[in-house]
Amino acid sequence: MGQLISFFGEIPSIIHEALNIALIAVSIISILKGVINIWGSGLLQFIVFLLLAGRSCSYKIGHHVELQHIILNASYITPYVPMPCMINDTHFLLRGPFEASWAIKLEITDVTTLVVDTDNVANPTNISKCFANNQDERLLGFTMEWFLSGLEHDHHFTPQIICGNVSKGEVNAQVNITMEDHCSQVFLKMRRIFGVFKNPCTSHGKQNVLISVSNWTNQCSGNHLSSMHLIVQNAYKQMIKSRTLKSFFAWSLSDATGTDMPGGYCLEKWMLISSELKCFGNTAIAKCNLDHSSEFCDMLKLFEFNRNAIKTLQNDSKHQLDMIITAVNSLISDNTLMKNRLKELINIPYCNYTKFWYVNHTGFNVHSLPRCWLTKNGSYLNVSDFRNQWLLESDHLISEILSREYEARQGKTPLGLVDVCFWSTLFYVSSIFLHLLRIPTHRHIIGEGCPKPHRLSSNSVCACGLFKQKGRPLRWAGKV
């Protein structure tokens, strides 16, 4: 397809070449004649007849196309997951899973009730310690992990979480969202879970989310859409993950053929004396960038580190090598001047950098690169003294001219045009054999006129209703 597009774009410049015009003419004639031969052979009519024999004379479009739907009953899912609901713009409830009798109360306020201490700072992985000595400590921690995971709590979004002492009348936890980025993210994620409410980030000052446990007394009505939003936001974060070290295997990075190649995406697994090659594309690499809990991802990070280290070493080595090359070139330049002086002293032809010779092709106005005309005993050499050199240079020049002319001619005849000419000619030759076969196109009732356009079945019946007598003798007839 790309060759055809480039071919059509070059049509104005193509037609200037006689050879291209001939190729275009042969291609068009071959394609037209091939289509005529195939139509005359009856192959297309025979295929249409077999598809429609015995059916109605009208066409049906979309016979196998149906509009279907599926209904998801969320009532089977929501009782087993935390159910969020909103009381007002600042108070929210998160009922525990399995239709628990308790709920986690969330309050967005500018009041600070807890202060930072060395023992009361928590994070999403150990949030359950804020609900210690509670009867449902495990489910409370699980529910809060779901909620914080829905807020996309990660190393970029890390609001401070402080645990409180319930026995002293304090709340279970306090999340500091005073920072503008933290407040905006909490507001956007909670609005998706609980629904639309007033933005608390408009008031510039301290902002906290106070978390406490209360009894569930139907303070607010639940919505299955809120539960589904909470599920969707945790769909890829609550999978059970196990990580085991398989020291029985040894992995090495290689290319698709098994050759060691640091920086590739193929791993060769060795198990005793056999090996297995596995290649991973950009999907696996992107997955590793998202989730780092696998040995494969750790190994890629290690290889990436080594590759960067090698690249840095190569850059430093290249810099040192460039400095060495510069110094050597300077020495060579000085050495060249010394050699020319020595050649002059020992009567050997040398270059005085004043006169140069080259081979010029007057027909194409092309010349070779100038070369130094050597000097001996204070005078320039005769042409016969370096005849072999300029003859060899002329051969190289002619070869270069012919090569350029060949490349220019090849460039004026696109490869797509040659392909079209070849395949159209092959298509035409193939259609000649089909035309000679004279493929039959329909069934004919013996002794009567041709039943076209009626399509008779094998028992001489047509769905159009004209031929109703079954079992009449038939014969195959070709295109008339």
From Swiss-Prot:
Any one of the GO BP annotations: fusion of virus membrane with host endosome membrane
- What domain of life? Viruses
Q: Where is this site: Important for GP-C-mediated membrane fusion?
A: 33
Instruction: Give binding positions for Zn(2+) 1.
Output: 57, 454, 462, 464
Q: Where, in residue ranges, is this chain on the Extracellular side? A: 2-17, 59-419
Q: Membrane spanning segments where?
A: 18-33, 420-440
Q: Where are the Cytoplasmic topological domains?
A: 34-58, 441-480
Q: Which GO terms describe its cellular component?
A: host cell endoplasmic reticulum membrane; host cell Golgi membrane; host cell plasma membrane; membrane; viral envelope; virion membrane
Disulfide pairings: 85-220, 130-163, 183-201, 266-279, 288-297, 351-372
Q: Does the keyword NAD apply?
A: no
Give the family per the record.
Belongs to the arenaviridae GPC protein family.
- Record's protein name: Pre-glycoprotein polyprotein GP complex
